[in-house]
C-alpha cells in the first residue's frame, strides 16, 4: 500500500493579492488519489492564479502548498503545465520545439526522440512534426502544447482551459 504522501497535493489557507485586489482568498483543498480534478468558478475567480501558485510560477502571499509532504517550489516538482495562453513558436518546426522543451526538462536526446514519436503518434500529429507551428490549426497547436506538458513524464499534469479550441 502506498504511503499517505505518495500522491498528496495540499493547499491550505492560500491567498494572493495583486495591487490591493484579492485574487485568491484563503483557499484550501487536498487531493490524495490519482484522478481528474477541476477548479470551477466564474471569470476572475482566481483559478489561473491558484494554478500558477500551485506550480510555483508566482508566489503566494500566505498559506501552504505541498506536494508529497514537501513545500512546492518551481525547482523541486516534476509537473507538466498546459497554460491558458498558448505559446508555440510560429516559424519553428514542431519537432525542434519538442526537442527544446524536452531539453529544458533535462531529458536525454534518445529519450526525447522516443517520447516525441510516441506522443505524436498517440495524438495523431506525426505528419506535422516537420512543419512550422504557424501552418497548424489552433486545435493541433494545442495538441503540440499538450505534448510539451507531458513529454517528460511528469508526476502531475495541470491544464488551464484545456479544451478551448479542440474539436
Show where each model-derived region lies.
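Hydrophobic anchor residue at the start of the ABC signature
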Residues: 146
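Conserved ABC ATPase "signature" region
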Residues: 99, 103, 111-128
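Conserved ABC transporter NBD signature motif
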Residues: 63-77
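A short, proline-enriched helix->beta-strand linker immediately N-terminal to the Walker B motif
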Residues: 151-155
Amino acid at each position: 500500500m502506498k504511503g499517505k504522501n505518495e500522491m498528496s497535493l495540499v493547499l491550505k489557507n492560500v491567498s494572493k493579492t495583486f495591487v490591493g485586489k484579492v485574487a485568491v482568498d484563503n483557499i484550501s483543498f487536498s487531493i490524495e488519489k490519482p484522478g481528474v480534478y477541476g477548479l470551477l468558478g466564474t471569470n476572475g475567480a482566481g483559478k489561473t492564479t491558484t494554478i500558477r501558485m500551485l506550480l510555483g510560477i508566482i508566489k503566494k502571499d500566505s498559506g501552504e502548498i505541498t506536494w508529497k509532504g514537501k513545500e512546492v517550489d518551481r525547482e523541486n516538482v516534476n509537473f507538466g503545465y498546459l497554460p491558458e495562453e498558448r505559446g508555440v513558436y510560429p516559424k519553428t518546426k514542431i519537432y525542434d520545439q519538442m526537442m527544446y522543451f524536452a531539453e529544458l526538462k533535462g531529458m536525454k536526446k534518445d529519450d526525447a526522440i522516443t517520447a516525441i514519436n510516441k506522443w505524436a503518434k498517440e495524438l495523431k500529429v506525426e505528419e506535422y512534426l516537420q512543419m512550422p507551428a504557424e501552418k497548424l490549426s489552433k486545435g493541433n497547436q494545442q495538441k503540440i502544447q499538450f505534448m510539451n506538458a507531458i513529454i517528460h513524464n511528469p508526476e502531475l499534469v495541470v491544464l488551464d482551459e484545456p479544451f478551448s479550441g479542440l474539436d
